[in-house]
Amino acid sequence: MKYCFDIDGTICSTNCHYEDAKPYKEVIDKINSLYNSGEYIILYTSRGSGSGIDWLEFTQKQIDEWGVQHHELLLGKPQYDIFVDDRAINNKEWYKQNNLKVTE
């Protein structure tokens, strides 16, 4: 199965200051558990979509430091206020389904 996780607000806290983002360890542990059980993990972010800044190298270093196991890191996710998709799960619902207690 393929899982696609947003980065900011899903696996880490952020107030649009990516340098100050704090990882959600419990979420990262769950992602790593999925990875280790053979699931395909994609990390997807809109970092730089509005500003045009290339955050790829910084983001790769950051998620490596946090120990997030993944197969792909994709930038270029569009910025939006509401995302409608037939396969989307809200991060808070996913936390609840997986008994994750995330504090921001």
What is the predicted function of each stretch?
Residues 1-104:
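Catalytic phosphate/metal-binding cores of nucleic-acid and nucleotide-processing enzymes, i.e., regions
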